[in-house]
Design a protein with these regions (language model features):
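Cysteine-centered motifs
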Residues: 5, 16, 30-33
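Polybasic, lysine-rich low-complexity intrinsically disordered segments
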Residues: 3-4, 13-15, 39
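Charge-dense polyanion-binding interfaces
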Residues: 124-159
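Aromatic-residue-lined binding/catalytic grooves and analogous aromatic/hydrophobic interfacial grooves
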Residues: 156-173
């Protein structure tokens, strides 16, 4: 859903009219207003932070602290979506080979998880965003993110189980 950012620019004393994007109930500001101040980075919540409908552009526009944290939250969401709670496609494995724990279904009722599981197009967008976050991490820090392997495992599982290839992001609901 596209809306306009209504944040006042402190340095210009005017209302910003740039587009912003919403996923689930997550309210994001446009790129020029976004500083991460409204975001809870704790492990208690998972979120999807979207600054652009293109998953790759959205990843490049996020600040460093989100590039570090968001691949893990993406893996946590995808592991719930792939588990018995939604698609029942199997497990996603951490860097050490152990699967993400989905037994209790943590985050399964979170609005962002529900959004991502609502259609394969939403799931595809989240996977591409997670992979783009991991790539952006590599670009900024010169090393692979700990979730890199899990994200690409999720992508391969998606191709195998959904019977779809992730190529179009404009189909996100």
């Amino acid at each position: 859903l596209e809306k306009k950012c209504s944040t006042s620019h402190q340095f210009q004393k005017r209302k910003c009219l740039q587009p912003i994007w919403y996923v689930g109930y997550v309210d994001l500001l446009c790129h020029c207003c976004y500083d991460g101040s409204k975001i809870n980075l704790g492990f208690k919540y998972v979120n999807i932070f979207v600054t652009n409908p293109d998953p790759h552009k959205s990843a490049t526009e996020l600040p460093d602290k989100h590039i570090v944290k968001m691949p893990l939250e993406t893996c946590q969401m995808l592991s719930i979506i792939y588990s018995k709670w939604y698609y029942d496609w199997g497990e996603i494995h951490k860097k050490d080979g152990t699967p993400y724990n989905t037994e209790k279904g943590a985050f399964r009722n979170h609005p962002c998880t529900k959004w991502a599981a609502d259609s394969i197009f939403n799931t595809a967008w989240l996977i591409q965003h997670g992979c783009a976050l991991s790539d952006e991490y590599s670009y900024r820090y010169g090393k692979l993110h700990g979730c890199h392997k899990a994200l690409f495992e999720a992508k391969k599982t998606f191709h195998r189980c959904a019977g779809e290839v992730i190529t179009c992001y404009c189909m996100v609901e």
